[in-house]
A protein has these predicted regions:
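Membrane-embedded helix-loop-helix hairpins and adjacent transmembrane boundary segments
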Residues: 1-369
C-alpha cells in the first residue's frame, strides 16, 4: 500500500486527464483546490459503502443460499434479486439499477471525452491537420468516441472470462496500473527539475510500461524463490509493488536521457520554482517533509508487520504527523498575522482541509491495513 498505491494515487489526483479537466474548469485556483478536496472526502466513503455492501451480501447469501459460492462480480445483481425485488416496491429495482448504470456512465463518459481530447489535439491537430477548425476537431472527437466505445466493447468480450474466479476490476486495475508509473514520473520530474527534457519524459513513460510488465515474472523466477523476499513480498509480486519498482526505473531513465539531450530553455522555466509556486528553499523544505514522512510511514509499516505496533497506534501517529506537515505553514502565517494584530481563520485555509483529508486517508490505510 505504501509503494505502488501511492504512485497510483498521485496519478489519479494529479495527472489523470478526466480529473485534471475538472480542476481546469474551475474559476480560480482556490476553487479548483476546494473541488478536489471535496471530491477526496467523498472518495473516502467508497470503501465503507462497497465493503459494507460486500459484508451484508456475504451474510445474506450464507443464510438464503447455504453452500453456494457467489463470485464478487455477481454479488450485486444477486442482491437485487434476493433483497430489493422481494420488497415489492414498484420500480425500486429499476431505480437502483439506473443509479448503478448512471454512476458507470459518469466515469466512462469522462474517460472517453478525455481520450478523444488527447488524440484530437495531441495527435490529429499536431501531426495530421495543424490548420483544423473547431468544427473539424469536434467531428473528429465524436468519431473517435464512437470508435473507442465499439473497440472497448469488443476488447471486453475478448479478455473477460465469465468463468474466472478473479475479479474483473482487479484484472483491469492490474493492467491499467502498468501504464501510469512512467506518466507520474514524467509529470513529477518535469515540474520539479528544470533539466528535464521531452525525450526524458518519453523515456520514463516507455520505461515504466516495460518494467511494469517485466518485473513480476522476473521477480517470480529469481527473488521470489528466496526465503527472505518471499517472506516479505510473497512468491508472486503484487502489482502494486511492481508499479513502485517501475517508477524508480522511470526516474533513472528520465534523468539519464535528460542529461544526454538538449533542454528547451523556455520550457525549462515551467517548473514549480520557475513559475513562482515555490522558492528553492520552500521546495527543499517540501522534499524534506515528504522524505521524512515516507520514512516514518515505512517504519510504522515495519513495526506493524513485526506486530510491535497495533494498527490504531500506527494510524494515529501517521495521521497526526501528516496533518501537521500540511498545516505547519498555515500555523506560521497565523502566528505572524496575530503578532501584527490581524485575525485569520485556520479553517478557511485549503491546506487545513487538504491536510485533514490526507490524515484521514493515512489513518484508514494503517487502521484497516
Amino acid at each position: 500500500m505504501l509503494s505502488g498505491l501511492m504512485v497510483l494515487h498521485f496519478y489519479y489526483w494529479g495527472a489523470n486527464q478526466f480529473i485534471v479537466q475538472r480542476a481546469l474548469a474551475a474559476k480560480s485556483d482556490k476553487e479548483a483546490r476546494a473541488g478536489v478536496i471535496t471530491a477526496g472526502f467523498a472518495k473516502l466513503l467508497i470503501p465503507f459503502i462497497s465493503i459494507g455492501t460486500g459484508i451484508a451480501a456475504y451474510y445474506v447469501f450464507a443464510e438464503r443460499m447455504p453452500g453456494v459460492q457467489v463470485d464478487g462480480d455477481t454479488a450485486f445483481p444477486l442482491l437485487l434479486r434476493e433483497v430489493v425485488a422481494p420488497a415489492g416496491i414498484a420500480g425500486l429495482v429499476g431505480l437502483v439499477a439506473a443509479g448503478l448504470i448512471g454512476a458507470i456512465l459518469s466515469s466512462v463518459d469522462s474517460m472517453l471525452n478525455s481520450a478523444a481530447t488527447l488524440i484530437t489535439f495531441d495527435f490529429y491537430k499536431r501531426f495530421i491537420n495543424p490548420q483544423a477548425t473547431d468544427r473539424q476537431l469536434i467531428r473528429i472527437g465524436r468519431v473517435l468516441i464512437g470508435v473507442m466505445v465499439v473497440g472497448c466493447a469488443l476488447l471486453t468480450i475478448a479478455v473477460f472470462d465469465p468463468n474466472t474466479k478473479q475479479l474483473f476490476f482487479t484484472y483491469v486495475a492490474s493492467h491499467q496500473s502498468k501504464l501510469v508509473g512512467g506518466v507520474v514520473v514524467a509529470f513529477a520530474v518535469g515540474m520539479l527539475w528544470k533539466g528535464a527534457t521531452a525525450a526524458g519524459g518519453f523515456a520514463s513513460i516507455i520505461t515504466g510500461v516495460v518494467v511494469s510488465y517485466a518485473v513480476v515474472p522476473v521477480y517470480g523466477a529469481t527473488l521470489g524463490k528466496t526465503e527472505l523476499f518471499s517472506g516479505m513480498f510473497g512468491s508472486n509480486l503484487n502489482f502494486f509493488h511492481g508499479v513502485f519498482v517501475a517508477a524508480i526505473f522511470a526516474v533513472l531513465a528520465n534523468i539519464v536521457v535528460s542529461k544526454m539531450t538538449q533542454s528547451d530553455e523556455q520550457k525549462s522555466s515551467l517548473t514549480f520554482v520557475g513559475l513562482g509556486v515555490f522558492t528553492e528553499a520552500s521546495l527543499r523544505t517540501l522534499i524534506t517533509k515528504v522524505t521524512l514522512s515516507l520514512l516514518l510511514y515505512a517504519l510504522l509499516g515495519f513495526l506493524m508487520w513485526q506486530e510491535i505496533a497495533v494498527p490504531l497506534v500506527a494510524a494515529l501517529v501517521a495521521s497526526t504527523w501528516t496533518w501537521l506537515m500540511f498545516i505547519n505553514t498555515n500555523l506560521q502565517s497565523l502566528l505572524t498575522a496575530s503578532s501584527k494584530g490581524r485575525v485569520q481563520s485556520l479553517i478557511r485555509e485549503d491546506k487545513f482541509w487538504g491536510g485533514l483529508l490526507a490524515a484521514c486517508a493515512i489513518f484508514m490505510l494503517y487502521y484497516f491495513k
